[in-house]
């Protein structure tokens, strides 16, 4: 669970990170209950690789943050199996298989660059219910 604390701390401090890399995500996506949805994370420095240790963090409307995925594809303890991380082409991806209304949230991707993390702006996922 230590990596989750690290990610949350870095999320709070990410505005102070100095980097030439920019991490981009879809600003918003909409899905329906039971559908599969994939959120992606791209780097301006080139293809995202396992060396970027892609992390995914969920922010619920009440500002509760939960670390979902670390190291590209390692699900955090207690995270439902419907959440999975991977690399698709040149991007990191978070796939939710069988989305539920409770999955409506903002999802942040963070990529590692040698000595610091860079966060994307987040994807607001709406689950129509």
Curated annotation (Swiss-Prot):
Pfam family, one: V-set
Modified-residue entries (Pyrrolidone carboxylic acid), positions: 20
Cleavable signal peptide: 1-19
GO biological process, one term: immune response
Protein name: Ig lambda-1 chain V region H2020
Keywords carried by this UniProt record: Adaptive immunity, Immunity, Immunoglobulin, Pyrrolidone carboxylic acid, Signal
Domain of life: Eukaryota
GO CC aspect terms: immunoglobulin complex
Occurrences of domain Ig-like (ranges): 20-125
